[in-house]
C-alpha cells in the first residue's frame, strides 16, 4: 500500500480525471511519502509517527500555502489536488534543483545578491503572516523547539551515537555548546517561520541563476525569525549577513545573526547522524566543527 503502485492507486481512486502513466516513489522526505507522476506532479502523503499528528500538520501546511500562493515573491507549491479527507494532495512540480552551497558559490555576484534579496522579501512576508494561518482544527499552533529541548534530545538520543566517531575534546565542545543553547533566553519576538529553509527546499531555476521556488512548508511553526536564516551560513558569512541586512535593514533585531549562528552550529552537529552515508562530507565536517564551535562559544559565552 505504501509503495509507488499502492499510492498511485489511491491517487487514481481519488482523482479519476487525472491521467498519468508513470508513478515514481521519491526517497526524499522524512515526514512524507512522495510520489512523482510523469515528472510533472508531486503528491505528498504525510507519515504518521508516534507523538506527531502529521496529517493535521499537512492540513495546516495546505492552508498556509493557499494564503501565500498569490502574494509570495517566490513561487510556492499550489495544490490543485487535495483528497476529500485532506490526507494527501498534489501540486504541479516546480522545475529546479536544490540550491547546494557549491551551486550558490558558482553563481555570479549579481545573481547571488538578487536571490538573497528575494528571499529577504519572502521572509518578511512569511514572518508577517498571522500564526493562526497554521492553526490546527483544535486551535493548536506548532512551535519551534526550545534550546533546552534540543539539549535534552542531545543527551538522551544523539550524544552516544556521535561519541562513537568524534574525539573527546570535540565531544566536550559539543556538550558545552548544547548547555549554552539551553541557556539561551527567548527571542525578542516570535513569528510564523518556514521551519526547514535548507538547500533541499530552495530550488534553483534550470539556468542556475535564479530561484524557481521554495517548497516543503510541513515544518512551519511559531518561532524565532533567526531560525529561517540558519542555513544561509552554509553559503558563507557574507551571504548570511546580506540576507540579515535586507531582512532587517533598520537593525531592530541586533541579535538576529548571532542566534542564527547558534542554530547553524546545531545543524552542523546534527549532520553527523548521516556519517555512514556521506563519509567524505563527514570527514570535512569533523575538520570544520572544532573551529566553528569555538567561534560560536566565544561569541556566545
For every predicted segment, state its role.
Residues 48-51, 144-155, 226-233, 257:
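Nucleotide-sugar-dependent glycosyltransferase catalytic core
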Residues 9, 66, 245:
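Active-site phosphate/pyrophosphate- and oxyanion-stabilizing loops and adjacent acidic/basic residues
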Residues 21-145, 169, 187:
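ATP-binding pocket architecture of kinase catalytic cores
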Residues 4-5, 62, 241:
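Short, surface-exposed alpha-helical segments at coil->helix boundaries
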Residues 46, 69, 103, 215, ...:
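Short, flexible helix/strand-to-coil boundary loops that buttress conserved ligand/catalytic motifs
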Residues 2-20, 95, 106-117, 125-195, ...:
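An alpha-helical support segment within catalytic cores of ATP-dependent transferases
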Residues 30-37, 43, 176-227:
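Active-site acidic catalytic loop and adjacent metal/ATP-binding pocket
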Amino acid at each position: 500500500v505504501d509503495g509507488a503502485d499502492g499510492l498511485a492507486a489511491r491517487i487514481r481512486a481519488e482523482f479519476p480525471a487525472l491521467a498519468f502513466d508513470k508513478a515514481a516513489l521519491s526517497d526524499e522526505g522524512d515526514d512524507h511519502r512522495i510520489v512523482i507522476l510523469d515528472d510533472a506532479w508531486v503528491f505528498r502523503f504525510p507519515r504518521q509517527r508516534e507523538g506527531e499528528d502529521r496529517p493535521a500538520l499537512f492540513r495546516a501546511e495546505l492552508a498556509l500555502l493557499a494564503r501565500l500562493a498569490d502574494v509570495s515573491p517566490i513561487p510556492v507549491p499550489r495544490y490543485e489536488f487535495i483528497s476529500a479527507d485532506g490526507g494527501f494532495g498534489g501540486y504541479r512540480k516546480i522545475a529546479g534543483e536544490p540550491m547546494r552551497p557549491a551551486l550558490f558559490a558558482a553563481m555570479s555576484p549579481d545573481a547571488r545578491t538578487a536571490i538573497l534579496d528575494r528571499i529577504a522579501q519572502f521572509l518578511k512576508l512569511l514572518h508577517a503572516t498571522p500564526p493562526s494561518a497554521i492553526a490546527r482544527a483544535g486551535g493548536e499552533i506548532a512551535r519551534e523547539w526550545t534550546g533546552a529541548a534540543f539539549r535534552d534530545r542531545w543527551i538522551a538520543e544523539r550524544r552516544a551515537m556521535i561519541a562513537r566517531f568524534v574525539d573527546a575534546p570535540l565531544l566536550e565542545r559539543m556538550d558545552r555548546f548544547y548547555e549554552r543553547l539551553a541557556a539561551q533566553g527567548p527571542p525578542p519576538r516570535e513569528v510564523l517561520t518556514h521551519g526547514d529553509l535548507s538547500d533541499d527546499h530552495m530550488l534553483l531555476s534550470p539556468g542556475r541563476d535564479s530561484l524557481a521556488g521554495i517548497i516543503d512548508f510541513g515544518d512551519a511553526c511559531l518561532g524565532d525569525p533567526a531560525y529561517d536564516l540558519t542555513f544561509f551560513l552554509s553559503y558563507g558569512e557574507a551571504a548570511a549577513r546580506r540576507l540579515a541586512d535586507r531582512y532587517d535593514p533598520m537593525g531592530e533585531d541586533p541579535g538576529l545573526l548571532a542566534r542564527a549562528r547558534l542554530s547553524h552550529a546545531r545543524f552542523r552537529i546534527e549532520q553527523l547522524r548521516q556519517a555512514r552515508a556521506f563519509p567524505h562530507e563527514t570527514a570535512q565536517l569533523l575538520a570544520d566543527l572544532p573551529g566553528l564551535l569555538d567561534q560560536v562559544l566565544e561569541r556566545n559565552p
